Amino acid sequence: DNLNLTEKLNKFLSKKKIRNENFPSHISENIVKFAIFKKYGIMPCWDTNKGDAVINKMNIRIQIEIKGFMSDGPSSFGPTEMWDMLYFVDAKDTMNCNFKVYEIKLSNKNNVFRNIKLSKKETYGEIADSKRRPRGSFEKIFKPQLGDHCKLIFDGHISELDNTI
């Protein structure tokens, strides 16, 4: 298993550490689906041609974007990506199968989100408008600047999302 190998190698390295691999999107997307179902009783659909998931209920369509991370490295967004709600999956404790899911009920067109400072000089909106990929760390950039717009909706072991138990 690559995660175990990375962890073991990092114990022996004193100057440079090996960064964790990107968290697999198909896993983060399913974690979010089941976290939404656990919280709201609504199961998003993964079969969508835009974004990562969608909720279709009573003629209302909610486009969902999902970002998973295992380190403080930046999450990257396509400059033309569109969503109605954004979810971050904190997979830093993936070795123990513990995850956190954060919900942000802001679209990428919302001024609060567009005004997130990703650098000293540029906001999310300015970078996206210039057709470049906005990038930022959830813990260092998004969570602190979003404040009450960023809600923890799940914090626990993956087995807690199994609605068949």
Which stretches of residues belong to each language-model region?
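Nucleic-acid endonuclease domains
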Residues: 1-59, 66-165
